[in-house]
Amino acid sequence: ISGDFAAIFDPNTLNQDLAIYNELPFTVLFVDGNHENFTLLNSYPVSMWNGGKVHIIKDNIIHLMRGQVYSIEGKTIFTFGGAVSVDQYRRIENVSWWKEEMPSEEELNEAKENLLKYNNQVDYIITHTCDAITIRNYLAYFRGKVSEIFMDNEMLDYFETNVKYKHWYFGHYHFDGKITDNKTEVYNSFYELR
């Protein structure tokens, strides 16, 4: 899941919100989006899993943390969740909006260090939002309007210009569509990583 997992949001309904995922016959992996309860999400202990840091929510529900590279079924997957909420003005801090939605410089630096261990080459990149280059060059054609560019998008430009990858998946813009030969916006669809 490429962000806005949102099942870890209300502590009072947490078990109910996770129930649908508990019943699935596979492990659910997700990067955080901007609509997450980061206080609750970050209350889970940090563990190492397949080469990178994670929050294990349940045995079959795992949060892939920002700036990590995982080896899964012979593939390398780099993750970097988070995004800016364009509707912050109508949300309440630490109730319906958390400042941790925006990736930090520390997370970016950790990402750069981890990617260097793989010579800046991975099979897949999974983020919540996308880089500013993609917004400027492609997203307007799919959404019928130009999306605003925020600091998080510019932060992700580093990965576009410095990392070799086969495919990049992101989910912030709430539609399904192949943007380029190697970039896909994911909303309700499933894609097999081959």
Stretches with model-predicted labels:
Residues 14-17, 43-47, 92-94, 139-142, ...:
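Short, glycine/charged-enriched secondary-structure capping and boundary segments
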Residues 1-4, 27-35, 64-65, 80, ...:
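Active-site neighborhood of phospho(di)ester-bond hydrolases with catalytic His/Asp-centered motifs
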Residues 69-73, 144-147, 157-162, 173-194:
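Binuclear metal-dependent phosphoesterase catalytic core
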Residues 24-28, 73-75, 120-121, 164, ...:
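Short glycine/proline-enriched coil/turn segments at helix->beta-strand junctions
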Residues 1-72, 145, 149-156, 161:
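Core catalytic region of metal-dependent phosphoesterases/phosphodiesterases
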Residues 6-11, 34-40, 70, 85-88, ...:
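Active-site environment of divalent metal-dependent phosphoester hydrolases
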Residues 52, 59, 73-151:
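Active-site-proximal loop/helix segment associated with metal-binding centers of metalloenzymes
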